[in-house]
Amino acid sequence: MTTQILMEKDTEVFVRLICEPHVKMELNHYFRFRPNGYQFMPMFRRKKWDGYVYLFNMDSNRIYAGLKSEISRFSVDREYELIDNTGEIFEPISNDDYFKFLTSFPCEYKLRDYQSLAVRHSIDNKRCVLLSPTASGKSLIIYYLIRYYLPEKALVIVPTLSLVSQMYSDFEAYAKIDDSFDAEQLVHKIYGGQEKETDKPIVISTWQSLYELNKDFFSDFSLVIGDEAHLYKARSLTKILKNLENTPYRIGTTGTLDGVEVHKLILEGLFGSIKKVTTTKELIKNKTISSIDINCLILKYNKKECAVVSKMNYQEEIDFIVSHPERNKYICNLVESLKGNTLVLFQLIEKHGNILHSILEEIVDSSRKIFFVYGGTDADSREKVRELVEKEKDAIICASYGVYSTGINIRNIHNIVFASPSKSRIRNLQSIGRGLRKSETKDSARLYDISDDLTHNDRKNYTLNHFSERIKIYSSEQFPYKIYVISLKG
Protein backbone atom coordinates (compact mmCIF):
# COMPACT_ATOMS: atom_id res chain seq x y z
CA MET A 1 0.00 0.00 0.00
CA THR A 2 1.27 3.47 -0.92
CA THR A 3 2.40 5.61 1.99
CA GLN A 4 0.21 8.71 2.27
CA ILE A 5 0.70 12.22 3.62
CA LEU A 6 -2.47 14.20 4.26
CA MET A 7 -1.93 17.97 4.10
CA GLU A 8 -4.51 20.19 5.83
CA LYS A 9 -4.70 23.94 6.29
CA ASP A 10 -3.98 25.24 9.80
CA THR A 11 -3.67 29.01 9.28
CA GLU A 12 -2.22 31.16 6.49
CA VAL A 13 1.13 30.52 8.19
CA PHE A 14 1.06 26.74 8.71
CA VAL A 15 -0.24 23.52 7.20
CA ARG A 16 -0.60 20.23 9.09
CA LEU A 17 0.89 17.00 7.74
CA ILE A 18 -0.93 13.87 8.92
CA CYS A 19 1.19 10.78 8.35
CA GLU A 20 2.73 7.68 9.90
CA PRO A 21 5.43 8.03 12.62
CA HIS A 22 8.30 6.93 10.36
CA VAL A 23 7.30 9.58 7.79
CA LYS A 24 7.25 12.19 10.56
CA MET A 25 10.84 11.26 11.36
CA GLU A 26 11.81 11.64 7.71
CA LEU A 27 10.09 15.04 7.50
CA ASN A 28 11.81 16.12 10.69
CA HIS A 29 15.23 15.34 9.23
CA TYR A 30 14.47 16.67 5.76
CA PHE A 31 13.23 20.08 6.88
CA ARG A 32 16.11 21.14 9.07
CA PHE A 33 19.23 23.27 8.76
CA ARG A 34 22.14 24.53 10.78
CA PRO A 35 22.29 28.34 11.09
CA ASN A 36 25.50 30.27 10.48
CA GLY A 37 27.78 30.16 13.50
CA TYR A 38 25.85 27.39 15.26
CA GLN A 39 29.12 25.85 16.48
CA PHE A 40 29.87 28.97 18.53
CA MET A 41 26.50 29.10 20.28
CA PRO A 42 26.58 28.30 24.03
CA MET A 43 23.83 25.65 23.84
CA PHE A 44 25.76 23.74 21.16
CA ARG A 45 29.05 24.06 23.01
CA ARG A 46 27.44 22.72 26.19
CA LYS A 47 26.01 19.82 24.13
CA LYS A 48 22.44 20.86 25.02
CA TRP A 49 21.52 21.33 21.33
CA ASP A 50 22.49 19.46 18.16
CA GLY A 51 22.87 22.68 16.14
CA TYR A 52 19.82 22.09 13.93
CA VAL A 53 16.71 24.23 13.49
CA TYR A 54 13.76 21.91 12.78
CA LEU A 55 10.89 23.31 10.70
CA PHE A 56 8.48 20.38 11.04
CA ASN A 57 6.96 20.08 14.52
CA MET A 58 6.41 16.39 15.25
CA ASP A 59 3.99 17.12 18.11
CA SER A 60 1.65 19.58 16.36
CA ASN A 61 2.33 18.20 12.83
CA ARG A 62 2.74 21.80 11.66
CA ILE A 63 5.13 23.17 9.05
CA TYR A 64 5.28 26.51 7.22
CA ALA A 65 2.70 26.74 4.42
CA GLY A 66 5.22 28.36 2.09
CA LEU A 67 7.08 25.05 1.91
CA LYS A 68 4.29 23.26 0.03
CA SER A 69 6.38 22.84 -3.12
CA GLU A 70 9.24 21.39 -1.03
CA ILE A 71 6.78 19.03 0.68
CA SER A 72 5.61 17.92 -2.77
CA ARG A 73 9.23 17.33 -3.84
CA PHE A 74 9.84 15.34 -0.65
CA SER A 75 6.82 13.14 -1.45
CA VAL A 76 7.67 12.58 -5.12
CA ASP A 77 11.28 11.62 -4.32
CA ARG A 78 10.04 8.90 -1.94
CA GLU A 79 7.02 7.87 -4.04
CA TYR A 80 4.65 8.87 -1.24
CA GLU A 81 1.12 10.01 -2.08
CA LEU A 82 0.52 13.63 -1.03
CA ILE A 83 -3.19 14.40 -0.55
CA ASP A 84 -3.72 18.17 -0.55
CA ASN A 85 -6.83 19.02 1.49
CA THR A 86 -5.91 22.68 2.07
CA GLY A 87 -8.60 23.81 -0.35
CA GLU A 88 -6.28 26.33 -2.00
CA ILE A 89 -7.00 26.87 -5.68
CA PHE A 90 -4.41 28.54 -7.90
CA GLU A 91 -5.91 29.99 -11.06
CA PRO A 92 -3.45 32.04 -13.14
CA ILE A 93 -4.78 35.46 -14.11
CA SER A 94 -5.86 35.52 -17.76
CA ASN A 95 -4.05 37.69 -20.30
CA ASP A 96 -7.18 39.83 -20.71
CA ASP A 97 -7.64 40.37 -16.99
CA TYR A 98 -3.96 41.15 -16.48
CA PHE A 99 -4.02 43.69 -19.32
CA LYS A 100 -7.17 45.28 -17.83
CA PHE A 101 -5.39 45.60 -14.49
CA LEU A 102 -2.26 47.16 -16.02
CA THR A 103 -4.35 49.75 -17.84
CA SER A 104 -6.81 50.42 -14.99
CA PHE A 105 -4.78 53.33 -13.57
CA PRO A 106 -2.30 55.82 -15.05
CA CYS A 107 1.40 55.58 -14.14
CA GLU A 108 4.33 57.35 -15.79
CA TYR A 109 6.59 54.47 -14.78
CA LYS A 110 5.86 51.51 -17.01
CA LEU A 111 6.81 48.04 -15.89
CA ARG A 112 9.77 46.52 -17.67
CA ASP A 113 9.27 42.96 -18.94
CA TYR A 114 11.00 41.31 -15.97
CA GLN A 115 9.03 43.51 -13.53
CA SER A 116 5.75 42.61 -15.19
CA LEU A 117 6.62 38.90 -15.02
CA ALA A 118 7.38 39.32 -11.30
CA VAL A 119 4.02 41.03 -10.67
CA ARG A 120 2.14 38.37 -12.61
CA HIS A 121 4.00 35.51 -10.91
CA SER A 122 3.14 36.99 -7.50
CA ILE A 123 -0.54 37.33 -8.39
CA ASP A 124 -0.71 33.79 -9.81
CA ASN A 125 1.05 32.13 -6.87
CA LYS A 126 -0.25 34.32 -4.00
CA ARG A 127 2.98 33.75 -2.09
CA CYS A 128 6.61 33.79 -3.21
CA VAL A 129 10.07 35.29 -2.71
CA LEU A 130 11.19 37.50 -5.60
CA LEU A 131 14.96 37.25 -6.08
CA SER A 132 15.92 40.49 -7.78
CA PRO A 133 19.13 42.51 -7.39
CA THR A 134 19.63 46.01 -6.08
CA ALA A 135 18.52 48.75 -8.53
CA SER A 136 16.11 46.43 -10.36
CA GLY A 137 13.06 48.52 -9.40
CA LYS A 138 11.51 46.39 -6.66
CA SER A 139 9.47 49.30 -5.28
CA LEU A 140 7.57 49.60 -8.59
CA ILE A 141 6.76 45.87 -8.43
CA ILE A 142 5.52 46.40 -4.86
CA TYR A 143 3.40 49.39 -5.92
CA TYR A 144 1.67 47.41 -8.68
CA LEU A 145 0.96 44.52 -6.31
CA ILE A 146 -0.59 46.88 -3.78
CA ARG A 147 -2.72 48.44 -6.54
CA TYR A 148 -3.90 44.98 -7.61
CA TYR A 149 -5.17 44.10 -4.12
CA LEU A 150 -6.58 47.51 -3.16
CA PRO A 151 -8.84 48.21 -1.25
CA GLU A 152 -7.68 45.22 0.81
CA LYS A 153 -5.20 46.17 3.54
CA ALA A 154 -1.50 45.81 2.78
CA LEU A 155 1.49 45.82 5.11
CA VAL A 156 4.90 46.66 3.60
CA ILE A 157 7.80 45.79 5.90
CA VAL A 158 11.23 47.35 5.27
CA PRO A 159 14.55 46.95 7.12
CA THR A 160 15.45 50.60 7.83
CA LEU A 161 13.89 53.97 8.71
CA SER A 162 15.26 55.46 5.49
CA LEU A 163 13.33 52.94 3.42
CA VAL A 164 10.02 53.89 5.05
CA SER A 165 10.38 57.44 3.73
CA GLN A 166 11.80 56.30 0.42
CA MET A 167 9.03 53.77 -0.25
CA TYR A 168 6.41 56.43 0.55
CA SER A 169 8.14 58.91 -1.80
CA ASP A 170 8.31 56.27 -4.53
CA PHE A 171 4.57 55.62 -4.21
CA GLU A 172 3.93 59.37 -4.49
CA ALA A 173 6.04 59.51 -7.65
CA TYR A 174 4.34 56.47 -9.21
CA ALA A 175 0.88 57.98 -8.55
CA LYS A 176 1.79 61.52 -9.63
CA ILE A 177 -0.65 61.54 -12.58
CA ASP A 178 -3.23 59.31 -10.87
CA ASP A 179 -6.00 61.23 -9.11
CA SER A 180 -7.42 58.00 -7.67
CA PHE A 181 -4.33 57.31 -5.53
CA ASP A 182 -3.46 59.93 -2.92
CA ALA A 183 -0.52 58.66 -0.86
CA GLU A 184 -1.32 61.02 2.01
CA GLN A 185 -4.85 59.59 2.28
CA LEU A 186 -4.01 55.94 1.61
CA VAL A 187 -0.52 55.28 3.03
CA HIS A 188 0.48 55.30 6.71
CA LYS A 189 4.13 55.37 7.80
CA ILE A 190 5.27 53.78 11.07
CA TYR A 191 8.68 54.66 12.46
CA GLY A 192 10.26 56.37 15.45
CA GLY A 193 7.26 56.73 17.75
CA GLN A 194 4.65 57.28 15.02
CA GLU A 195 1.08 56.20 15.79
CA LYS A 196 0.66 52.51 14.96
CA GLU A 197 -3.12 52.33 14.52
CA THR A 198 -4.62 53.69 11.31
CA ASP A 199 -7.65 53.39 9.04
CA LYS A 200 -5.49 53.78 5.93
CA PRO A 201 -5.34 50.61 3.79
CA ILE A 202 -1.55 50.67 3.21
CA VAL A 203 1.00 50.61 6.03
CA ILE A 204 4.77 50.94 5.58
CA SER A 205 6.86 50.07 8.62
CA THR A 206 10.26 48.87 9.76
CA TRP A 207 10.27 45.38 11.25
CA GLN A 208 11.68 46.90 14.45
CA SER A 209 8.46 48.92 14.92
CA LEU A 210 6.28 45.81 14.46
CA TYR A 211 8.21 43.27 16.48
CA GLU A 212 6.62 44.04 19.87
CA LEU A 213 3.05 44.56 18.64
CA ASN A 214 0.41 42.03 19.66
CA LYS A 215 -1.45 39.78 17.23
CA ASP A 216 -4.56 42.00 17.06
CA PHE A 217 -2.68 44.66 15.08
CA PHE A 218 -2.06 42.21 12.23
CA SER A 219 -5.51 40.62 11.95
CA ASP A 220 -6.94 42.75 9.10
CA PHE A 221 -4.10 42.61 6.57
CA SER A 222 -4.72 40.63 3.38
CA LEU A 223 -1.32 41.32 1.81
CA VAL A 224 2.13 41.43 3.39
CA ILE A 225 5.26 42.37 1.47
CA GLY A 226 8.63 41.88 3.15
CA ASP A 227 11.06 44.09 1.24
CA GLU A 228 14.75 43.12 1.48
CA ALA A 229 13.60 40.22 3.67
CA HIS A 230 17.10 38.77 3.93
CA LEU A 231 18.15 41.69 6.15
CA TYR A 232 15.77 41.01 9.05
CA LYS A 233 16.71 39.15 12.19
CA ALA A 234 15.35 35.63 11.74
CA ARG A 235 13.50 35.59 15.07
CA SER A 236 11.87 38.98 14.42
CA LEU A 237 10.76 38.13 10.89
CA THR A 238 9.35 34.79 12.07
CA LYS A 239 7.39 36.40 14.90
CA ILE A 240 5.85 39.08 12.66
CA LEU A 241 4.90 36.67 9.87
CA LYS A 242 3.41 34.21 12.36
CA ASN A 243 1.21 37.01 13.71
CA LEU A 244 -0.14 37.54 10.19
CA GLU A 245 -2.10 34.29 10.43
CA ASN A 246 -5.08 35.64 8.42
CA THR A 247 -2.97 37.06 5.58
CA PRO A 248 -3.26 34.94 2.40
CA TYR A 249 -1.04 36.99 0.06
CA ARG A 250 2.61 36.96 1.13
CA ILE A 251 5.43 38.31 -1.02
CA GLY A 252 9.07 38.63 -0.01
CA THR A 253 11.81 40.38 -1.97
CA THR A 254 15.54 39.79 -1.67
CA GLY A 255 18.62 40.80 -3.61
CA THR A 256 20.70 37.79 -2.60
CA LEU A 257 20.45 34.43 -0.88
CA ASP A 258 24.16 34.05 -0.09
CA GLY A 259 25.24 34.44 3.52
CA VAL A 260 21.88 35.84 4.59
CA GLU A 261 20.65 36.35 8.15
CA VAL A 262 17.43 34.42 7.46
CA HIS A 263 17.93 30.92 6.06
CA LYS A 264 16.48 30.17 2.61
CA LEU A 265 14.11 27.53 4.05
CA ILE A 266 12.65 30.02 6.54
CA LEU A 267 12.24 32.69 3.84
CA GLU A 268 10.41 30.20 1.63
CA GLY A 269 8.39 28.89 4.56
CA LEU A 270 7.17 32.33 5.62
CA PHE A 271 6.56 33.67 2.10
CA GLY A 272 6.74 30.99 -0.60
CA SER A 273 8.99 29.50 -3.28
CA ILE A 274 11.80 31.59 -4.73
CA LYS A 275 11.35 33.16 -8.16
CA LYS A 276 14.45 34.56 -9.87
CA VAL A 277 13.42 37.83 -11.51
CA THR A 278 16.64 39.08 -13.14
CA THR A 279 20.37 39.51 -12.50
CA THR A 280 22.74 42.45 -12.23
CA LYS A 281 24.60 41.25 -15.33
CA GLU A 282 21.38 41.21 -17.39
CA LEU A 283 20.42 44.69 -16.18
CA ILE A 284 23.82 46.14 -17.14
CA LYS A 285 23.78 44.33 -20.50
CA ASN A 286 20.35 45.79 -21.29
CA LYS A 287 21.50 49.24 -20.10
CA THR A 288 18.76 49.27 -17.47
CA ILE A 289 21.32 50.20 -14.82
CA SER A 290 24.76 51.80 -14.91
CA SER A 291 27.89 49.84 -15.62
CA ILE A 292 30.38 49.85 -12.76
CA ASP A 293 34.18 49.85 -12.63
CA ILE A 294 35.78 48.72 -9.38
CA ASN A 295 39.19 50.01 -8.35
CA CYS A 296 40.63 48.01 -5.45
CA LEU A 297 43.21 50.11 -3.61
CA ILE A 298 45.41 48.07 -1.25
CA LEU A 299 47.23 50.30 1.22
CA LYS A 300 50.64 48.96 2.32
CA TYR A 301 52.03 49.84 5.76
CA ASN A 302 55.60 49.85 7.09
CA LYS A 303 57.11 46.78 8.78
CA LYS A 304 56.93 48.27 12.27
CA GLU A 305 53.19 48.92 11.99
CA CYS A 306 52.60 45.44 10.53
CA ALA A 307 54.41 43.87 13.49
CA VAL A 308 52.33 45.86 15.98
CA VAL A 309 49.02 45.01 14.29
CA SER A 310 49.90 41.29 14.07
CA LYS A 311 49.41 41.07 17.85
CA MET A 312 46.01 42.77 17.77
CA ASN A 313 42.54 41.22 17.81
CA TYR A 314 39.95 42.12 15.17
CA GLN A 315 38.47 45.16 16.93
CA GLU A 316 41.90 46.55 17.79
CA GLU A 317 42.93 46.22 14.14
CA ILE A 318 39.81 48.11 13.05
CA ASP A 319 40.53 50.88 15.57
CA PHE A 320 44.13 51.12 14.31
CA ILE A 321 43.05 51.36 10.68
CA VAL A 322 40.29 53.95 11.03
CA SER A 323 42.40 56.21 13.26
CA HIS A 324 45.50 56.10 11.03
CA PRO A 325 46.21 59.75 10.04
CA GLU A 326 47.91 58.99 6.71
CA ARG A 327 45.16 56.57 5.71
CA ASN A 328 42.42 59.11 6.41
CA LYS A 329 44.38 61.82 4.62
CA TYR A 330 44.79 59.56 1.58
CA ILE A 331 41.06 58.78 1.48
CA CYS A 332 40.06 62.44 1.73
CA ASN A 333 42.56 63.50 -0.96
CA LEU A 334 41.13 60.78 -3.20
CA VAL A 335 37.57 61.97 -2.56
CA GLU A 336 38.54 65.58 -3.20
CA SER A 337 40.04 64.62 -6.58
CA LEU A 338 36.98 62.75 -7.87
CA LYS A 339 34.58 64.39 -10.30
CA GLY A 340 30.83 63.98 -9.84
CA ASN A 341 28.76 63.13 -6.76
CA THR A 342 30.76 60.95 -4.38
CA LEU A 343 29.43 58.69 -1.62
CA VAL A 344 31.95 57.94 1.16
CA LEU A 345 30.87 55.00 3.32
CA PHE A 346 32.22 54.47 6.84
CA GLN A 347 31.48 52.05 9.67
CA LEU A 348 32.18 53.89 12.94
CA ILE A 349 30.67 57.34 13.40
CA GLU A 350 32.75 58.78 16.27
CA LYS A 351 36.02 57.02 15.45
CA HIS A 352 35.94 57.43 11.68
CA GLY A 353 32.99 59.27 10.14
CA ASN A 354 33.53 62.45 12.13
CA ILE A 355 37.26 62.45 11.31
CA LEU A 356 36.70 62.03 7.55
CA HIS A 357 34.01 64.70 7.57
CA SER A 358 36.28 67.18 9.40
CA ILE A 359 39.21 66.64 7.00
CA LEU A 360 36.94 67.00 3.96
CA GLU A 361 35.49 70.23 5.35
CA GLU A 362 39.06 71.57 5.53
CA ILE A 363 40.41 70.53 2.12
CA VAL A 364 37.38 70.61 -0.20
CA ASP A 365 36.51 73.80 -2.05
CA SER A 366 33.67 75.67 -0.33
CA SER A 367 31.63 75.63 -3.56
CA ARG A 368 31.11 71.86 -3.18
CA LYS A 369 28.38 70.70 -0.81
CA ILE A 370 29.28 68.12 1.85
CA PHE A 371 26.56 66.11 3.61
CA PHE A 372 26.98 63.97 6.73
CA VAL A 373 24.40 61.22 7.30
CA TYR A 374 24.37 58.52 9.98
CA GLY A 375 21.95 56.58 12.20
CA GLY A 376 21.22 59.67 14.31
CA THR A 377 20.01 61.62 11.28
CA ASP A 378 16.20 61.55 11.32
CA ALA A 379 14.32 60.05 8.38
CA ASP A 380 12.99 63.38 7.06
CA SER A 381 16.48 64.91 7.03
CA ARG A 382 17.85 61.90 5.17
CA GLU A 383 15.10 62.30 2.59
CA LYS A 384 16.00 65.99 2.14
CA VAL A 385 19.65 65.04 1.57
CA ARG A 386 18.52 62.55 -1.06
CA GLU A 387 16.46 65.19 -2.86
CA LEU A 388 19.29 67.74 -2.74
CA VAL A 389 21.92 65.34 -4.08
CA GLU A 390 19.69 64.42 -7.03
CA LYS A 391 20.10 68.06 -8.17
CA GLU A 392 23.84 68.31 -7.47
CA LYS A 393 26.74 67.50 -9.81
CA ASP A 394 29.76 67.59 -7.47
CA ALA A 395 28.52 66.86 -3.94
CA ILE A 396 30.13 64.65 -1.28
CA ILE A 397 28.02 62.49 1.02
CA CYS A 398 29.73 61.00 4.08
CA ALA A 399 27.41 58.26 5.28
CA SER A 400 27.42 55.29 7.62
CA TYR A 401 27.11 51.87 5.96
CA GLY A 402 23.97 51.14 7.97
CA VAL A 403 22.06 54.11 6.56
CA TYR A 404 23.14 54.07 2.93
CA SER A 405 23.85 50.44 2.13
CA THR A 406 20.23 49.32 2.58
CA GLY A 407 18.30 51.21 0.01
CA ILE A 408 18.45 55.00 0.01
CA ASN A 409 17.64 55.58 -3.63
CA ILE A 410 20.08 58.21 -4.89
CA ARG A 411 20.47 57.62 -8.61
CA ASN A 412 22.85 60.52 -9.09
CA ILE A 413 25.94 58.89 -7.50
CA HIS A 414 29.03 58.76 -9.71
CA ASN A 415 31.62 57.48 -7.22
CA ILE A 416 31.45 55.24 -4.15
CA VAL A 417 34.35 54.97 -1.70
CA PHE A 418 34.49 52.08 0.81
CA ALA A 419 36.42 53.94 3.52
CA SER A 420 35.94 51.31 6.24
CA PRO A 421 36.57 47.56 6.12
CA SER A 422 33.37 45.56 5.71
CA LYS A 423 32.99 41.78 5.58
CA SER A 424 29.22 41.68 4.99
CA ARG A 425 28.38 40.35 1.53
CA ILE A 426 24.91 41.87 1.69
CA ARG A 427 26.13 45.28 2.82
CA ASN A 428 28.73 45.38 0.04
CA LEU A 429 26.24 44.44 -2.66
CA GLN A 430 23.68 46.91 -1.36
CA SER A 431 26.32 49.66 -1.27
CA ILE A 432 27.35 48.91 -4.85
CA GLY A 433 23.67 49.20 -5.71
CA ARG A 434 23.80 52.87 -4.77
CA GLY A 435 26.01 53.41 -7.82
CA LEU A 436 24.09 51.21 -10.23
CA ARG A 437 21.06 53.45 -10.58
CA LYS A 438 21.07 55.49 -13.77
CA SER A 439 20.34 59.21 -13.93
CA GLU A 440 20.29 61.92 -16.59
CA THR A 441 23.92 62.80 -15.81
CA LYS A 442 25.25 59.25 -15.41
CA ASP A 443 25.39 55.91 -17.17
CA SER A 444 28.45 54.49 -15.38
CA ALA A 445 29.85 54.51 -11.85
CA ARG A 446 33.15 53.87 -10.11
CA LEU A 447 33.76 52.08 -6.83
CA TYR A 448 36.95 52.58 -4.84
CA ASP A 449 37.38 49.64 -2.48
CA ILE A 450 40.06 50.58 0.05
CA SER A 451 41.73 47.70 1.89
CA ASP A 452 44.74 47.42 4.18
CA ASP A 453 47.72 45.08 3.86
CA LEU A 454 49.29 44.64 7.29
CA THR A 455 50.77 41.21 6.56
CA HIS A 456 53.51 40.18 9.01
CA ASN A 457 55.62 37.03 8.53
CA ASP A 458 53.06 35.50 6.14
CA ARG A 459 50.25 36.22 8.63
CA LYS A 460 47.49 38.10 6.85
CA ASN A 461 45.57 40.64 8.90
CA TYR A 462 41.81 40.25 9.46
CA THR A 463 40.62 42.99 7.14
CA LEU A 464 42.85 41.82 4.27
CA ASN A 465 41.05 38.48 4.48
CA HIS A 466 37.76 40.37 4.29
CA PHE A 467 39.03 42.07 1.14
CA SER A 468 39.62 38.61 -0.35
CA GLU A 469 35.96 37.82 0.36
CA ARG A 470 34.89 41.02 -1.42
CA ILE A 471 36.94 40.00 -4.47
CA LYS A 472 34.97 36.73 -4.53
CA ILE A 473 31.75 38.79 -4.54
CA TYR A 474 32.93 40.92 -7.47
CA SER A 475 33.92 37.78 -9.39
CA SER A 476 30.61 36.00 -8.70
CA GLU A 477 28.61 39.09 -9.73
CA GLN A 478 30.89 39.47 -12.78
CA PHE A 479 31.83 43.05 -11.93
CA PRO A 480 35.08 44.18 -13.64
CA TYR A 481 37.79 45.14 -11.15
CA LYS A 482 41.44 46.22 -11.05
CA ILE A 483 43.83 46.02 -8.10
CA TYR A 484 46.34 48.75 -7.24
CA VAL A 485 48.89 48.68 -4.40
CA ILE A 486 49.72 52.00 -2.70
CA SER A 487 52.43 52.50 -0.07
CA LEU A 488 51.32 54.74 2.79
CA LYS A 489 53.71 57.21 4.35
CA GLY A 490 54.46 56.92 8.04
Regions found by a protein language model. Name each.
Residues D124-I146:
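Walker A/P-loop
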Residues S139-Y144, Y148-A173, L348-E350:
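Conserved Walker A/P-loop ATP-binding site and its immediately adjacent core
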Residues L163-K189, I363-V364:
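Conserved helix-turn-beta segment of the N-terminal RecA-like "Helicase ATP-binding" lobe
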Residues L186-E197, N354-I355, R368-S405:
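Conserved helicase ATPase core of P-loop NTP-dependent helicases/translocases
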Residues F221-S222, A399, I408-P421, A445-D449:
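A short beta-strand element within the Helicase C-terminal
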Residues H230-D293, Y474:
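Post-DEXD/H (motif II) to motif III coupling segment of the RecA-like Helicase ATP-binding lobe
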Residues V309-Q347, K351-E362:
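Conserved interdomain hinge at the start of the Helicase C-terminal
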Residues R434-S468:
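Conserved segment of the helicase C-terminal RecA-like domain
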